[in-house]
């Protein structure tokens, strides 16, 4: 923990330096503009967004008749720009009930550097294995695991690799990804391949992928995943189908997930989410499911934002039933605190105080 506070001190000092550097750059841009340089562009934002993210609450298991207060993790995130085209992103679990240490990469969910222009994005580092599912695509800290599929609860998604995304137009994105296989377990020469399409139209959003996850030399688990989101003003729903098999002839019959997840945004300060799914889990040693055979999972969640126009503080109440055959209730709070904004506010107050002396 001592090393963490040293690291956090370095981060805060870096933010302070970046704030000052940004001010100098902005002043230089204004001076150039005042000298009549019509070609001067706006100053780029190079101050990193550094934040901490956490969730805690009370959870009750009705099958076991046990309940307790607990936290779902404390995360540190850093995002920023190196240049107009290069950016970086970092998200690390500082502490959780199953943390294995502070500085090991096992607790780093993602650590990436990206190059992006109008038609291309190249990303390298540790990132999520691309899978066509909105349930899977969301932040862990925003998910209610007892409402989710066994696939979500079993898949080792954070892997080192690289991806290339192409933008044929404003509404479509095509992605190719190569990374370590989620079934490699640290062994070399086992890789995963993904081909994905994300579309964002006026009332429809898609996230489709075709995947191959290597588990032995020349042997792959194949997967097809189709996530579809339909938006109608304050109401939306996701319709998803995912299927997996080591033998291509079993692709649509042995191991699959089918789910529908509606969301109703009843006001600016709250929404209601639901989920109902049917999953068939084959007897497969690769996935280590918590349950074999067919079963249904479902749940409801209500989310509230007590501060107007501020979604970084969220209250929730959720109930779900999944592969553990229990009914679980969770009531809690999720919060995100921007260290960068705090430093900016401190610098601004100090500057104003000095100006008034």
Mark where each language-model region is.
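Beta-barrel outer-membrane channel/assembly domains of diderm bacteria
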Residues: 21-122, 164-174, 229-231, 263, ...
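N-terminal signal peptide c-region/cleavage motif recognized by signal peptidases
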Residues: 16-18
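Residues that define the transmembrane beta-barrel architecture of outer-membrane proteins
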Residues: 65-74, 104-109, 116-118, 156-160, ...
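Transmembrane beta-barrel strands of outer-membrane/channel proteins
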Residues: 52-58, 90-94, 124-126, 176-180, ...
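Sec-dependent N-terminal signal peptides
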Residues: 4-13
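Detector for outer-membrane/organellar transmembrane beta-barrel domains
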Residues: 34-36, 41-48, 195-298
């Amino acid at each position: 923990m001592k090393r963490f506070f040293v690291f956090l001190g370095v981060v805060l000092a870096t933010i302070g330096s970046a704030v000052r550097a940004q001010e100098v750059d902005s002043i230089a841009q204004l001076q150039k503009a005042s000298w009549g340089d019509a070609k001067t562009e706006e100053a780029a934002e190079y101050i990193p967004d550094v934040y901490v993210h956490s969730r805690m609450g009370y959870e009750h298991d009705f099958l076991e008749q046990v309940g307790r207060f607990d936290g779902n993790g404390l995360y540190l995130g850093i995002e920023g720009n190196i240049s107009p085209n290069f950016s970086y992103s970092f998200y690390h679990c500082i502490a959780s009930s199953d943390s294995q240490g502070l500085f090991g990469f096992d607790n780093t969910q993602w650590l990436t550097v990206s190059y992006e222009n109008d038609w291309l994005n190249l990303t390298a580092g540790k990132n999520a294995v691309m899978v066509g599912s909105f349930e899977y695509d969301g932040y862990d800290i925003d998910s209610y695991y007892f409402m989710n599929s066994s696939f979500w609860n079993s898949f080792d998604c954070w892997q080192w690799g690289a991806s290339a995304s192409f933008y044929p137009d404003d509404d479509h994105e095509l992605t190719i990804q190569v990374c370590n296989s989620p079934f490699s377990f640290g062994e070399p020469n086992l890789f995963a391949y993904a081909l994905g399409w994300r579309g964002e139209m006026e009332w429809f959003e898609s996230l489709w992928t075709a995947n191959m996850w290597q588990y032995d030399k020349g042997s792959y688990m194949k997967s097809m995943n189709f996530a579809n989101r339909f938006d109608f003003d304050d109401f939306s729903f996701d319709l998803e189908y995912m299927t997996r098999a080591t033998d291509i002839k079993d692709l649509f019959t042995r191991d699959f997930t089918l789910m529908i997840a509606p969301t109703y945004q009843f006001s600016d300060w709250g929404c209601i989410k639901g989920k109902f799914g049917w999953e068939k889990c084959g007897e497969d040693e690769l996935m280590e499911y918590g349950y074999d055979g067919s079963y249904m999972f479902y749940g409801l969640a209500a989310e509230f934002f007590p501060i107007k126009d501020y979604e970084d503080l969220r209250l929730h109440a959720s109930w779900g039933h999944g592969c553990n055959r229990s009914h679980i209730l969770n009531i809690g709070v999720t919060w995100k605190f921007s260290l960068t904004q705090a430093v900016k506010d401190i610098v601004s107050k100090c500057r104003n105080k000095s100006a008034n002396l």
